[in-house]
Design a protein with these regions (language model features):
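Short arginine-rich
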Residues: 73-77
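Short S/T/G/P-rich N-terminal loop/turn motif that feeds into the first structured element of a domain
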Residues: 1-51, 55-68, 78-105
Length: 105
């Protein structure tokens, strides 16, 4: 399983709007993509930062989403974020939520 972490700068006073957009617009878009498993978002209280972590079956699924779906997500989020988000991709090593064990265990 792979995850994409996207760090974003929120516009002033837009945390509630960001959360609404993720819940009502972004998650339904993500569910249409092959290999999508989960989305977890975090908003830093008192700061204008948010982190979105999407989980994918394979690295290829995550990369395909990055090529074909991510631009639509950015466009949808443009009302709540500013600047260019920073993206990092990781292989998931452990997760109690996703019932994943470390490789080699």
């Amino acid at each position: 399983m792979f995850t994409r972490h996207v760090m974003m700068k929120l516009r002033a006073n837009s945390a509630a709007e960001f959360t609404r957009i993720i819940e009502n617009e972004i998650i339904p878009l993500l569910r249409k993509h092959k290999g999508f498993r989960d989305e977890v978002t975090f908003v830093a209280p008192g700061r204008s930062e948010a982190l979105a972590s999407s989980f994918w079956d394979t690295k290829e699924d995550a990369e395909a989403y990055g090529r074909w779906g991510y631009q639509e997500v950015l466009k949808t989020l443009s009302k709540a974020i500013e600047g260019t988000p920073k993206i990092e991709t990781f292989e998931v090593a452990n997760s109690t939520f996703h019932k994943i064990a470390a490789k080699g265990a």
